[in-house]
Swiss-Prot record:
GO molecular function per UniProt: 6-carboxytetrahydropterin synthase activity; metal ion binding
Pfam families the record matches: PTPS
Name of the gene: queD
Keywords attached to this entry: Lyase, Metal-binding, Queuosine biosynthesis, Zinc
Enzyme Commission number, as recorded: 4.1.2.50
Protein name: 6-carboxy-5,6,7,8-tetrahydropterin synthase
Length: 138
């Protein structure tokens, strides 16, 4: 198996419902996402994937949905709608609390399989950095 990794950076805000500390409040991060893609063999050009294709598919989705958005739990829709109405802020709703763990799992299991559906490779893992020192891997 041969693996290639592409980094994508984006800025987004979120909050964790029922968190007992400061993460219960709206705040933001400079997220760094590392997408690891693998194949059993390279293509006729000697590549697993053209890094530009990862950018075209994954970064485009991130830019349209997550970058400079507010990522909220679907139970936060009332607050999200008020923020969107007042500021025009882009809101992305998740079924779970938008923790780094849940965001990475959502991308790996629900979003990226749809983006890369007709390709000869697969996403093996994602690393999502919430800060330079803290990340999750799924």
């Amino acid at each position: 198996m041969i693996k290639c990794t592409r980094r994508i950076e984006f800025d987004a805000g979120h909050r964790i419902i029922e968190h007992q500390n400061k993460c219960q409040f709206l705040h933001g991060h400079r997220y760094v996402l590392e997408i690891a893609i693998a194949a059993n063999k390279t293509d006729k050009l000697g590549m697993v994937i053209d890094f530009g294709l990862i950018k075209d598919l994954a970064k485009k989705w991130i830019d349209e949905n997550f970058d400079h958005s507010l990522i909220l739990h679907q139970d936060d829709k009332e607050m999200g709608q008020q923020i969107e109405n007042c500021t025009g802020q882009k809101i992305y709703y998740m079924q779970n609390n938008p923790t780094a763990e849940n965001i990475a799992t959502h991308l790996k299991n629900e979003i990226f399989p749809k983006l890369f559906v007709s390709q000869n490779f697969f996403v093996t893992s994602l690393k999502l950095y919430e800060t330079p020192n803290c990340f999750v891997e799924v």
